[in-house]
Amino acid sequence: MPNPVRFVYRVDLRSPEEIFEHGFSTLGDVRNFFEHILSTNFGRSYFISTSETPTAAIRFFGSWLREYVPEHPRRAYLYEIRADQHFYNARATGENLLDLMRQRQVVFDSGDREMAQMGIRALRTSFAYQREWFTDGPIAAANVRSAWLVDAVPVEPGHAHHPAGRVVETTRINEPEMHNPHYQELQTQANDQPWLPTPGIATPVHLSIPQAASVADVSEGTSASLSFACPDWSPPSSNGENPLDKCIAEKIDNYNLQSLPQYASSVKELEDTPVYLRGIKTQKTFMLQADPQNNNVFLVEVNPKQKSSFPQTIFFWDVYQRICLKDLTGAQISLSLTAFTTQYAGQLKVHLSVSAVNAVNQKWKMTPQDIAITQFRVSSELLGQTENGLFWNTKSGGSQHDLYVCPLKNPPSDLEELQIIVDECTTHAQFVTMRAASTFFVDVQLGWYWRGYYYTPQLSGWSYQMKTPDGQIFYDLKTSKIFFVQDNQNVFFLHNKLNKQTGYSWDWVEWLKHDMNEDKDENFKWYFSRDDLTIPSVEGLNFRHIRCYADNQQLKVIISGSRWGGWYSTYDKVESNVEDKILVKDGFDRF
């Protein structure tokens, strides 16, 4: 469950005078979560959407783009709102409803269960950028702390990719902050539990599911980036009844829910661009290169005005702030630039590792360093509030140079900061445009904990005494599969062997080679459950029950006897000498 937030944000066209006086009222009385996330009940919902960060709120607003028209400027307001117990996390609510659905505690009409699962998959992937917290009811004026004016400004074609090369618009936040005189400062926070259709649910409840989704934006908010990616709707979307007109998002795109796109068009609409970095003192220019088989990333010095003999390696910056290597081999996994600690305090070395949406050492910030927006500092989120950047060692020999992250204050004398240069000869402006994510893997760090010791699963199906390392076991939010990545990048998927036809109540699990995109075999699909979960009083540890889509079997491990450490699945809920509370990474569900 994501940490409950104290403040949330919403962009709204209504003025501060109106909101400060009356707050946000609901538009209807429909309390249907699936209709809410799929936007099929405009004007009828009892829920009100907010975002966890100003950036997420602005990105959602900014996705409603159109051609810039000076005669008709667009204005709105960004509101900061104090959250309370009526605010619920949308993704956690979706995950909990998936749990209840698999446990048969939510009932549906024929076909609705599959529709609901597809809606939750969209919430996990295409709409995850919204970082939504929604209210079950109106927001009082006393909860609204302040507001900022948000308006649209033109972006010249040279700094924004657009099929027609038009001048288009993006958004900005304007000072000053406007404070609400009716605001009440209280120590409240959002609800730490998921929303339920009926509080204290004890018997199965019925939820109706829409058969269509009205989606204003499936770009993951990429269109509101600094130089945004305007979705190219030419040719028109094959499954849209009313496709968007180029960049003018004044209409709604209506999708049949069965063909709701899992990727934004911006995944493939941007041109590929290599990444060039320049030393701020020596002015040497380097091309960013990669050796994916060895998880290595390095720099080669080039003359940007001459054609390089080195092959171009393509990276892109996605909505999870990852700098991802574009895969050209059809691999099952994706790789991203990852900052790792070294023996030197505060100095990190950059390698490639499997892309994970919850890996803080894969999150990078681009900060423009000049008015023309042609030079960007690249900083790692791993160092928190410490200002940092990318560096290379000026004393390193050879033609390939390692890439480091270091604090800007008092760096070692042999290190020089590198910054991304954006111009026609080097990095294209499209690189600093966030692209929609291509993968949605979560580093789960799967294992178990017993009497002060950590144990990790082995590909043999048994266990080994150690804490599962980062970057080894993942959960795919798109396919619901758990997979193990070896150092040589071989991928094995957790498979449930238990078959109801055998009549047995349990069987071992196994790790198999498998196609990530195969979608029919539910023995490869798993979900994380809180049902009947008793949390041990161990500080900082995160536990879940893990169940298989196929007949809801539960994943367990034997903790005594000759079969110690064996992983298996079972129909039995209560058993002795086993551990059913599976350890997952702290932060597994926070991203």
Swiss-Prot record:
Keywords: Cell membrane, Cell projection, Cytoplasm, Disulfide bond, Glycosyltransferase, Host cytoplasm, Host endoplasmic reticulum, Lipid-binding, Membrane, NAD, Nucleotidyltransferase, Toxin, Transferase, Virulence. Residues 206-256 are annotated as: NAD(+)-binding pocket. Disruption phenotype: Among 102 tested antibiotic-resistant transformants, none had a deleted gene. Its EC number is 2.4.2.-. Pfam families: CARDS-D2_trefoil, CARDS_D3, Pertussis_S1. A motif (KELED motif, involved in host ER trafficking, solvent exposed in the crystal structure) lies at residues 268-272. Changing residue 36 to A: Loss of ADP-ribosylating activity. No change in binding to HeLa cells. Provokes a strong immune reaction in infected patients. Belongs to the bacterial exotoxin subunit A family. The main virulence factor for this bacteria, a mono-ADP-ribosylating toxin (mART), that transfers the ADP-ribosyl group from NAD(+) to multiple target proteins in vitro. Also elicits cytopathic effects in mammalian cells, such as disorganization and disruption of respiratory epithelial integrity in tracheal epithelium and vacuolization in the cytoplasm of CHO and HeLa cells as well as in mice and baboons. Has at least 2 host receptors SFTPA1 and ANXA2. Internalized by a clathrin-mediated process; protein is rapidly taken up at 37 degrees Celsius. Clathrin-independent or caveolin-dependent endocytosis were not detected. In HeLa cells internalized CARDS trafficks toward the nucleus by retrograde transport from early to late endosomes, then the Golgi apparatus; at 16 hours most toxin is concentrated in the perinuclear region in the host endoplasmic reticulum (ER). Failure to localize to the host ER prevents ADP-ribosylation and vacuolization. This is ADP-ribosylating toxin CARDS. It comes from Mycoplasma pneumoniae (strain ATCC 29342 / M129 / Subtype 1). The lineage of its organism: Bacteria, Bacillati, Mycoplasmatota, Mycoplasmoidales, Mycoplasmoidaceae. The gene is cards.
